[in-house]
Design a protein with these regions (language model features):
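Extended, low-polarity transmembrane helix blocks
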Residues: 1-50, 64-75, 79, 86-157
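Perimembrane loop-to-helix junctions flanking transmembrane segments
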Residues: 53-64
Length: 157
């Protein structure tokens, strides 16, 4: 009869290497950094909705869809970014932002239609957006951490 205890499952976040209390602070900082850029960019689009719509039309979106997609895209970017920053419905917000970034990337950074230097620049933007999607995937898995409205919301029901 073996007295050895079963191996414990590995901690996928390797929390043992993070000082106590820092993990949630780092998640908060990450949320502010990744969400903040979308808040700022979405706000700019909302304040200049006509220019944003013109840019979408110039990228080849059907003219009938532009008046619908421009406010939806700008609002989704702004409010999705706010939800990430404040940790409100973090996992849902992360999925919303993944969808937003995929659509925005396929509309604005189609590197395969460009030549030479512009192709290289658009490839960098495309790859950057793929990395941002990776950040949102992490938020989807980890949630908002201790310092988020999700935690307050769930504890007050």
């Amino acid at each position: 009869m073996s007295t050895a205890s079963p191996p414990s499952s590995p901690d996928p976040l390797n929390r043992a290497s993070i000082p106590p209390g820092w993990g949630d602070t780092i998640v908060l900082l990450g949320r502010i950094l990744i969400g903040g850029i979308f808040v700022q960019s979405g706000f700019d689009k909302l304040m200049g909705l006509d220019a944003f719509a013109a840019g979408l039309a110039a990228r080849g979106l059907p003219a009938a869809l532009v008046p619908v997609l421009a406010p939806i895209g700008a609002s989704g970017e702004f409010f999705g970014g706010l939800a990430i920053v404040f940790g409100l419905m973090t996992r849902c917000a992360a999925l919303l932002m993944i969808t937003f970034v995929i659509v925005a990337t396929l509309i604005s950074h189609r590197f395969w239609v460009f030549q030479a230097a512009e192709r290289r620049a658009q490839t960098v933007h495309f790859a950057k957006n793929v990395a941002i999607i990776g950040g949102f995937l992490f938020l989807f898995v980890t949630g908002g951490g201790r310092y988020c409205l999700d935690r307050w919301w769930c504890s007050n029901k």
